[in-house]
UniProtKB/Swiss-Prot annotation:
This is Cytoglobin. Expressed in brain and retina by non-neuronal cells (at protein level). This is the major globin expressed in vascular smooth muscle and is not present in the endothelium (at protein level). Its EC number is 1.14.12.-, 1.7.-.-, 1.11.1.-, 1.15.1.1. Its main location: cytoplasm. It catalyses: Fe(II)-heme b-[protein] + nitric oxide + O2 = Fe(III)-heme b-[protein] + nitrate; 2 superoxide + 2 H(+) = H2O2 + O2; Fe(III)-heme b-[protein] + nitric oxide + H2O = Fe(II)-heme b-[protein] + nitrite + 2 H(+); H2O2 + AH2 = A + 2 H2O. Residues 1-21 are annotated as: Disordered.
């Protein structure tokens, strides 16, 4: 069950530090192993996201009605979106050495989700938390604290760039749908 957050403000600043060379290598090594199973990992991430935060489905007419995780896993539309999400993440991870490229990719993602899809930016933070959960589970025995911190730093960097794009296009926080409350951020984690 979701909790309704207090005043969720886009103005709240996330830490946005560039990753060190060691952090980039740690993220890229983990990512390479995840990306080898791109579609399955992406589907696992989105299914968990939609099961734990069902209000996020409001932005997806093609599968907003789905409640059963197995039905979601089999959905061609969900699988396609999972591949798009993983592809965007792959572009970011592969270009961590190039801050301008990372910024450009995340600006495009942020602007599209703000202008075309009207997605509340908090869902990026929630989704990135789900991604970290899945990574931690996939590499339960091989996810040292340093790598976890590097991924947490990347999470902040992604959210910072995406919310900057929302601000750039003049995003105004949407009034929550009364039948589907917005999700809160997970209380645990970095």
């Amino acid at each position: 069950m979701e909790k309704v957050p207090g005043d969720m403000e886009i103005e709240r600043r996330e830490r946005s530090e560039e990753l060190s060379e060691a952090e980039r290598k740690a993220v890229q090594a983990t990512w390479a192993r995840l990306y080898a199973n791109c579609e399955d990992v992406g589907v696992a991430i989105l299914v968990r996201f939609f099961v734990n935060f069902p209000s996020a489905k409001q932005y997806f007419s093609q599968f907003r009605h789905m409640e059963d995780p197995l039905e979601m896993e089999r959905s061609p539309q969900l699988r396609k979106h999972a591949c798009r999400v993983m592809g965007a993440l792959n572009t970011v991870v592969e270009n961590l050495h190039d801050p301008d490229k990372v910024s450009s990719v995340l600006a495009l993602v942020g602007k599209a989700h703000a202008l075309k899809h009207k997605v509340e930016p908090m869902y990026f933070k929630i989704l990135s938390g789900v991604i970290l959960e899945v990574i931690a589970e996939e590499f339960a025995n091989d996810f040292p604290v340093e790598t976890q911190k590097a991924w947490a730093k990347l999470r902040g960097l992604i959210y910072s760039h995406v919310t900057a794009a929302y601000k750039e296009v003049g995003w105004v926080q949407q009034v929550p749908n009364t039948t589907t409350p917005p999700a809160t951020l997970p209380s645990s984690g970095p």
